[in-house]
Amino acid sequence: MPINIPKDLPAKEILEQENIFVMDEERAYSQDIRPLNIVILNLMPEKEKAETQLLRLLGNSPLQVNVTFLRPATHESKTTSKHHLEQFYTIFPHIRHRKFDGMIITGAPVEQMPFEKVTYWSELTEIMEWTKTNVTSTLHICWGAQAGLYYHYGIPKYPLPQKCFGIFEHSLEVKNVKLLRGFDDVFRMPHSRHTDVKREDIEKIPELTILSVSEKAGVCLVASNDGKQIFLTGHPEYDATTLKEEYERDLAKGLPIHIPESYFPNDDPTKEPLNTWRSHANLLFVNWLNYYVYQETPYEWE
């Protein structure tokens, strides 16, 4: 089934070239079917890239999905045009009255700052509190996961001695959970972060279950027992070249950065990396949409 997007969204042409089933709003409204309403709080600096990456995964499910893009009203983006934000994004006061079947809170390049020092932290906490009553299930990604764990459960983040950067293998801690249906016993996922959460802190919270871990990258996937809050410390949505672009960006800035682990063929940055995580990324999003959003949301919100 298709993902429904605004008619002129730049990601539409890219997705159609990749054979992703997309449908503009005019055609979608003519179908007699209850679509899922998903809101994406996009905190990534390169918003158009993040849009394409997430829509690619949302569009690979058998469910029709309506997407609303949300941005912080208390932060001015320096890397996305004002025209793009005004045309395709809304702000929280305009949607706080609505109910959504699902929400995605993306990562953000602010992980080395204390949460309370982030310019839009107060607004983000208001949104995260709102998800408790107005969203069936919320998927938090990377820094978004750390922010969610901190706000909802008081779990802190810790600086890493070296950036967690590369493609890492993960194992399943719980094999009979719906979110991991169809997963191999070992799967790969990109990580790109300077901070971490500790397993022992999460295990102290009886309302949380650790679903997947990596020997090198640590805790990967955590879920609240009611499925309303999902926390993902990696970036399954990343393109094959995203880590390469981040690596080259940091090199150009003279920042201390190591070659992404298990990423370039033979650790040679001149060779094109392969996407070895795509299938499980798609499976994760399909499982989330089906079992945690579609199966749990009411047909008509009260």
Swiss-Prot record:
Pathway it acts in?
Amino-acid biosynthesis; L-methionine biosynthesis via de novo pathway; O-acetyl-L-homoserine from L-homoserine: step 1/1
Q: Where is the active site?
A: C142, H235, E237
Q: Which GO terms describe its biological process?
A: L-methionine biosynthetic process from homoserine via O-succinyl-L-homoserine and cystathionine
List the Gene3D superfamilies: 3.40.50.880
Which key words tag this protein in UniProt? Acyltransferase, Amino-acid biosynthesis, Cytoplasm, Methionine biosynthesis, Transferase
Which GO CC annotations does the UniProt entry carry?
cytoplasm
Site positions (Important for acyl-CoA specificity) are E111
Q: Which top class of enzyme applies to this chain?
A: transferase
Which InterPro entries does its entry note?
Answer: Class_I_gatase-like, HST_MetA, MetA_family
Q: Which GO terms describe its molecular function?
A: homoserine O-acetyltransferase activity; homoserine O-succinyltransferase activity
Q: Which Pfam families match?
A: HTS
Record EC number = 2.3.1.31
User: Where does it live in the cell?
Assistant: Cytoplasm
Q: Where is this site: Important for substrate specificity?
A: S192
PANTHER family referenced in this protein's UniProt entry, alphabetically: HOMOSERINE O-SUCCINYLTRANSFERASE (PTHR20919:SF0)
State the similarity comment.
Belongs to the MetA family.
Function comment: Transfers an acetyl group from acetyl-CoA to L-homoserine, forming acetyl-L-homoserine.
Instruction: State the name under which the record lists this protein.
Output: Homoserine O-acetyltransferase
User: Organism source for this protein?
Assistant: Geobacillus sp. (strain WCH70)
Question: What gene codes for this chain?
Answer: metAA
